[in-house]
Amino acid sequence: MSTNDSTELLFTAVYESDEDAVVGLLRSGADPESVDEDGQTALYLAAVSDQPDIVRLLLAAGAAPDRLSSGSDAPLCGAACGGHTEVVRALLAAGAGPDTVEGFGFTALAWALRCGHVAVTEALLAGGADPDRPGPTGEPPLVAAARRGSPGCVRALLAHGARARSESLAEARRWLVLDVEAELRASLEQAYGADRDFVTHRYPQDGGDIVEVQLLDPKGNPVAGNDQQTGHAEIAGLLEAALAGS
């Protein structure tokens, strides 16, 4: 079997979540660090596809946990962005750097906080992620969690001694008086133009709600979206208590 053939078969097996095929291909000499024609690594594909068992197989066969896919995408960051907690734990257990920086300055913790993934945030902090390492725009993680509106992420950061508590309290209070739906819609209009159709959804999450605003095309299909949690009142209480006890 040629290298090209084994690479193609390995990626097909990962796409199809076929663990037995992955095992067979690796035993037959397929490179666990194979990349496709776009430069994507097999490990990154498995990580963002939430396939922890295949991630473990590739790591055990020698895939480097921190190797960037397509030159800029870290497997740990991809898993964190998707909320794939078990994959995050597998990568950390294999030696992935908890503060590895990928393209545009993102770390896995920055992605987890931006998306409000509490379990991933807890796993990263338990794995050694710096609770005070600034995100890509230079803001402290606690401020990012307060803006997101995720009480669970704020609790996790406070439990690990995160600083910038006064700034985070100010951010939580700022969002308390804002119309979350209107803010999300405005950000989409700024990016895609005004006079567009939108639809809003609300879902329970993290003891509160998550507000999702989607931009629709002329046929009514969603083409872009943004979301935000609404736990800012609870977050303000958590931060007030933390400041009072410090």
Name each model feature, range by range.
Residues 21, 53-54, 86-87, 119-120, ...:
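Conserved ankyrin/ankyrin-like repeat signature
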